[in-house]
Design a protein with these regions (language model features):
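A structural preference for short, hydrophobic beta-strand core positions in alpha/beta folds
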Residues: 33, 73-75, 177
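Active-site donor-binding loop signature of nucleotide-sugar glycosyltransferases
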Residues: 6, 118, 180
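Hydrophobic anchor at the start of a short beta-strand
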Residues: 30-32, 112, 175
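Beta-strand-loop-alpha "switch" segments that mediate conformational coupling across diverse proteins
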Residues: 175-182
Length: 182
């Protein structure tokens, strides 16, 4: 399992990262995506089909299914249950990408990719409802990779160093800086 998550509310680029991981890893693996399916009106485990309604499965899982029709896409609010169902119903799947699952402690991914918004540094943020943090910054020790998104085109080296110092808690962690191009 590769988990793509964050510790804040709001868009940090998890879905575009999930799409990039699926596109790359599908060359070597039979990949599935597991999402909670935010905004859906249903509960429990559902597989996303090309003709699924976004109200039933969520807009982002449907978007991914339409973009990657050969990828198994499922939604389940209980991620451990969702992983078990995917494995049972699709024994050929050998890699599951878990979208927005960093807070789910019942699952221990092989790789945790944590997305960080450069415009909202975690060291200056507070827990909900006073801020945008939905997990403690101390939990970042579980991350393997940090992808800092929305970086300015010319990010100062000192700003990169400060972010690395804030984020890296154990020696194996790596930080990557990205920006959107229009």
């Amino acid at each position: 399992v590769i988990c793509i998550g964050n510790i804040t509310v709001g868009g940090t680029g998890k879905t575009p990262m999930a799409e990039m991981v699926i596109a790359y890893m599908s060359q070597m693996h039979r990949v599935a995506l597991l999402s909670r399916g935010y905004g859906r009106r249903t509960k429990g485990y559902l597989e996303v089909k090309a003709d699924s309604r976004y109200r039933d499965v969520g807009d982002e899982p449907l978007q991914i299914k339409l973009k990657f029709p050969d990828t198994v896409v499922a939604v389940c609010e209980k991620r451990a249950d969702g992983i078990r169902r995917i494995c049972a119903e699709h024994p050929d799947v050998d890699l599951i990408v878990m979208d927005d699952g960093f807070q789910h402690r019942y699952v221990e991914p092989k790789v945790n990719i944590v997305m960080i918004d450069a415009t909202r540094p975690v060291q200056h943020d507070r827990m909900l409802p006073l801020g945008t943090l939905r997990d403690l910054p101390e939990e970042l020790h579980r991350a393997h990779y940090f992808v800092v998104t929305k970086c300015p085109e010319k990010m100062a080296p000192i700003d990169r160093r400060i972010l690395r110092k804030v984020l890296i808690q154990v020696a194996y962690q790596r930080v990557y800086f990205t920006r959107f191009e229009s």
